């Protein structure tokens, strides 16, 4: 019953996955669940259709070229595939957002001077460079840069924290 507005500063959704990182090298397939599992299953379903292949050998060609580097790139028993073209990933993400009823706004950039208004420690509204204002109950900064987080005064670490901080070796 919640509404979600996704604001993208450019014209795309999907981050690195839809911008050129066309394979995932995880070899712990059983650990993939939730939305990630759904995404990789949709990739599998897409490439299971013969009409999407321009090379008559289809998956066999793809597998010979790249599959040896990514644990064969798919798992038929799990119906998941980890090798894909960026435009396929973006289309899958767009479909998932549409099906979930997520409104997407493209080409909006956070105003880095006055872009965050808070009451106490809570963000109440954000302002974009074009002056448009958005109000919500919850804000998630899923950008590469983390500008919303930084402007809101959230503490963060640039680079890797010291091993001693969390008792790592």
Range-by-range predicted roles:
Residues 141-169:
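Glycine-rich loop(s) and the adjacent beta-strand/alpha-helix scaffold that form part
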Residues 129-138:
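Core beta-strand elements of the Rossmann-like FAD/NAD(P) dinucleotide-binding domain
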Residues 120-126:
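Short, hydrophobic/aromatic-rich segments at coil-to-beta transitions
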Residues 8, 39, 138, 144-147:
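Voltage-sensor-like transmembrane helices and their cytoplasmic interface
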Residues 2-3, 137:
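Nucleotide donor/acceptor-binding cores
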Residues 3, 8-115, 157, 166-167:
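Conserved N-terminal/central alpha/beta ligand/cofactor-binding core
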């Amino acid at each position: 019953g919640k509404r979600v507005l996704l604001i993208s500063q450019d014209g795309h959704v999907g981050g690195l996955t839809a911008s050129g990182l066309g394979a995932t090298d995880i070899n712990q397939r059983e650990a993939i669940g939730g939305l990630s599992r759904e995404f990789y299953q949709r990739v599998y379903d897409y490439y299971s259709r013969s009409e999407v292949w321009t090379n008559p050998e289809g998956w066999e060609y793809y597998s010979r070229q790249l599959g040896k580097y990514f644990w064969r790139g798919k798992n038929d028993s799990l119906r998941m595939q980890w090798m894909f073209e960026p435009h396929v990933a973006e289309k899958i993400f767009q479909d998932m957002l549409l099906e979930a009823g997520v409104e997407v706004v493209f080409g909006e950039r956070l105003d880095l001077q006055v872009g965050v208004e808070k009451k106490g420690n809570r963000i109440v509204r954000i302002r974009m460079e074009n002056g448009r204002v958005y109000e919500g109950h919850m804000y998630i900064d899923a950008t590469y840069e983390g500008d919303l987080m930084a402007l809101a005064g959230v503490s963060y670490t640039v680079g890797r924290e010291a091993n001693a901080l969390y008792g790592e070796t």
